[in-house]
Amino acid sequence: MSMRFIVGRAGTGKSTLCRQEIHKESQEHPEGLPLILLVPEQATHQMEMSLAHDPQSGGILRAQVLSFRRLGWRVFSEVGGGGKAVIGEVGKRMLLRRLLLNHRSDLRVFARSATRPGMADLLAQAIAEFKIYRITPDQLRGIEDADELLLQKTHELAFLYEELNKSLGTAARDPDDELNLVAGKISQAPFLQGAKIWVDGFKGFTPQELYVIQAMLGTAAEITVSLPLDPELLKAGTPRFKPGEELFYEPRQTYQGLVDLAREAKASISHVFLTETHRFEKAGLKHLERFYNAYPTQTFPGGDDSTAPDPLGIALFPAANKRAEVEGVARELRRLAREEGRTWRDCSVVTRDLPGYQGIIEQVFNAHEIPYFLDHKRPVIHHPLLELLLSAIETVQKDWAYEPLFRCLKTDFFPCSKDRIDRLENYCLAYGIHGSAWKGNRSWSYYPDPNHKEETAGLNETRQIIYDLFSPFDQAIRPHPEAGGPSVTVAQITEAIYELLIRLKVPEHLQEWAEAAHSRGDLAEAQLQNQIWDAVIQVLDELVAGLGEEVMDLSDFAMILTSGLENLQLGLIPPGYDQVLVGSLDRSRNPETAVLFLLGANDGILPGKPSDEGVFDELERLRLESKGIMLAPKGKVQVYEEQYFIYTALTRAREQLYISYPLTDEEGRGLTVSPVIHRLKMIFPGLPEKYLSLDEEEPGALPHPYALLPAYALHLQKLRQGSSLSPLWQAIRLWFLSQTAAFPQVQLLEKGLRDQNEEGKLPQPLARQLYGKRLVTSVSRLELFARCPFAHFAQYGLKLKERSNYRLSPPDMGQFFHAVLHDYAIALRERGLDWGELSKEQSWQLVNETAEPIALQLQNKILLSNARYRYLTHKLKRTVHHAVRVLGEHARQGVFLPMELEVKFGPQEALPPLEVPLSGGNSLLLRGQIDRIDGAVLGHEIYLRIFDYKSREAHVSLNQIYHGLDLQLLAYLDAALQGAQILVSSSGLAEGSKGSEGSEGSEDSEDSTIHPAGFLYFPVLEPQLKSKTLLYPEQLEKDRIKAVKVKGYLLADRQVLLAMDRDLENSSLLGIKLTKSGEFKKGSPILTEEQFALLRKHLQHFLRCSGEALLEGDISITPYRQGKHTACQFCSYKPLCHFDPYLPENNYRNLPVIQDEEFWQRVQSQDSEQYPEQHPPTSVPGETSRRALQKDGGNSPRGQELIWLGEDEAGAGKEDDGHE
């Protein structure tokens, strides 16, 4: 029984000596007792490979490479004790999550954070630390004379620690307890009796691991432990470390602990001191290892190879940023492979900040076609299988809600194509299908159009497949306490999950994905797909082992399972032999390598900052230590540990060490270099540096062609913008053009150089086929065309539209307002009532009567779908009620009467269309729907006023009219005036007029002249008032009515305006202001009749110009811009047009702001031939039009179903399908 120490600094051959001794033993005694090489878990694969490929070892017939965990398995397999189910790290976190939920009321310190994400992780780490350092719950409870917070913490941790052990019971075991169990059974393990054991690759051991070593001392013939330690420290026997020696702090402490164990066991102790370094082939690397931590500084004096091209073997790579840094490393790796014949496995890349570099390394190395292996555990929370588990449970929990259900369906495990799932999703979104609508055998038939029967049948087939697969899972885990059904246990839920996975053939899918990854050369992905099934099943097994018989609701189960799956990580072994190893500096074992790249040498990263995470802070750990509770070292010891990590990284390379660091972060802010760089420059004055940037021009620095493609695209863009290519890039371009078969992306990039992001014109025959010889269009279409011709083409030519969604949008609310106001007016007319006659209570009652049936028809009864929408319905009714109160005030103050409601004009409609002749015998016909036309007879004159309801504040200006951005009111007025005789005849206006002061009703409307009285936007809004004083209800009502302002233009005729508001001088309804002399104030929204005529002429001019442009095929990407407003602000087609104002061919149409005076000057200066006079018909057309008006103009109740009528808020009356 003996313990032997192999002690030496980095590169002195400790691991080599261990392998040589194992080789010698196996050669001398081929059939002797086992030769065990005990190494860190991460190094087992690497050491097995080393032994297997060592030509002297003869393989590993006697030798066994074990980690402490594998050693435990071997012991249990020989002597028993390993039959219990193992609850791993994931399982413990799930158990702790459950304990926190169950005992939250018993906790004080941890109560508030019990449900906080990550709390179970912190507690699991704390309890694991207690077990590893062999601290019992009783020891925690026994702490006295500490502050109250620390005492409460330790008592609560002791409670949770004990409850966790109880949860594990006798049926399961915690891996953190295994080494204690292993130590107790080692004496019974035959394979360890008389065995020789080498322990290599450790700088320190936990108390549990020391316990195992102590147990092996009693059975093994000899234990050899290699330690990375300067032999001079042991020879000197110094009790304290000198400056620079702190990096050996942990190995020195470990050595002392092992010596104490050996002496206690009365084992003999011997030493092998290795003082000569054998690893380093460059004098600089050898000097660096010996003197990096030596004080005073030992400057490199040169050496035997000082005349060689690179006597140091060390180079610094400052870089512009992280991407430039990794790009430079990738180029150097390819150069080493190309020029020096290096294999990929000769090179390693390490960093202290692997998460910060991982994504960039993956992108850049893939682009350079550098095979690499990322040595870290992969989190798999975003894997489709885990998403399936969590979304399936959430789907049942939320009763088949849309969002979790379609997350579940999009995992690709259901036997439905992506296209079928997408179509199903669109359908469900459009009609608000969720919950009970999925269940049962009732088919869906929400499409109102019978032409969709075939598509509906396909959707129902897909729904049935999903329901048949998913409903057994729903029924199995859904508790039914109201029906007296049994509660559901964790085991039952888990069994149902497993059965769902089998029904969906998840293992087969994963196997297919693994094979596909393997076939495309992604071996790491193939490994992951092969491992994920077993990992998930292990999590479910651990859940059952720990909580199987516990009754649990789905929300708690989902929370616990989520906490477990979030911590699920998979460790992969290198899938290929010749790969660049990419790893983190703090791994337990970083292997020796020929060439090493150390990335991220910045302050705060190298060395890393000591971690303050955990249940206990540094001060609390010191207090616990004073009470005899020894935990993992923190603070100062972590600083020593960081120095050791740096030492390890600097001494891994045999031939070449590259150290790189970015000078700026992603936002261009400067970064400070690491103290390591300053130290290196002190030791090696004149250390070579090479600055890395993304704009390299030296041919020797060119990367792999695939990695050049982004830079190639950038240079082509510069070429397109007028710059010239350097000779190097001219040569690169010629080479790429000769290799288009190997690089198909080049053709696309070159095409982009020639292509312009612009659309010309459709061929005229195609435009006429698309829009028709008689171009039937609407105001909203022409306004869109004025904003951007391409947007008009996308919406009305290509007929693109956004996905329908089952929600109440602003257009839906506008539709509701229009419908209620229409039916309210019809109800008044049928009851012989006037708008101004009803009291507030009576109008509210009538609004309710008219709104209820409309709410049933809107968006598949969306207003009745839940409590929120039912409340919103009440608010919408209040808004409409306020609108009718304001309209009632208009009626009380004036003599204008509603003539017709929702009057359609267009081909085959009540009123004729606005028709404009175009060139080539073509014509434009404008159609639409006018919300409300009011009329008044003043003397022998008839005046018409247009109202258009808006569910928002709307304004109209001459500037907008001039540019065609807002033509709605003007077009409606023009249509009403053209069909005025039809309106007057059908409405009986002349006979039913209230008259006005000084006027009488006309006896013969045929002899009356019809004039425009104005056009107005009426906002259907419920204003919110602010007042510093308390208002009585009557005053509040008046103020709220005054707050609703109509916007538009009115006729500049005092008699006409008095007919609208008899209190004109103090008008709150029209926004008209008068001077003391009774004149109109400047800025009042009034126009003369001649100006209304000019507006109508301008409309005709605009319609003609727009019609000609449409039929000429104008689909140009030319959005307007005026001030801060552009056509692109709320455009849905930006992903389609790719408009980019920075491209030379993409420019806004900058529209000047036209002031009112300039507007009239421009309109009046136009050639009169451009404005053909258009007179209203002098005689009433035939009875067909009159009957059509009586049928469609608003005299009958609304039909059975509401149909959204487009951008005009029920403006067009039917779909804008282009041509007649």
UniProtKB/Swiss-Prot annotation:
Descriptive protein name: ATP-dependent helicase/deoxyribonuclease subunit B
In its UniProt entry, the species of origin is given as Desulfitobacterium hafniense (strain Y51)
What Pfam families does this protein's entry cite?
A: ADDB_N (PF21445), PDDEXK_1 (PF12705), UvrD_C (PF13361)
Ranges of residues in domain UvrD-like helicase C-terminal: 283-590
The region called Disordered is annotated at 989-1008, 1162-1220
Composition skew (Polar residues), residue ranges: 1162-1171
Disulfide connectivity for this sequence is none
Entry keywords, A to Z: 4Fe-4S, ATP-binding, DNA damage, DNA repair, DNA-binding, Exonuclease, Helicase, Hydrolase, Iron, Iron-sulfur, Metal-binding, Nuclease, Nucleotide-binding
Task: Indicate the quaternary assembly.
Answer: Heterodimer of AddA and AddB.
**EC numbers, comma separated:** 3.1.-.-
The top EC class, named as a word, is: hydrolase
Keyword Transmembrane helix assigned to the entry: answer is no
Q: Which family does it belong to?
A: Belongs to the helicase family. AddB/RexB type 1 subfamily.
User: Which superkingdom does the taxonomy of this entry point to?
Assistant: Bacteria
Molecular function terms, GO-annotated: 4 iron, 4 sulfur cluster binding; 5'-3' exonuclease activity; ATP binding; double-stranded DNA binding; helicase activity; metal ion binding
Q: Name one GO biological process term.
A: double-strand break repair via homologous recombination
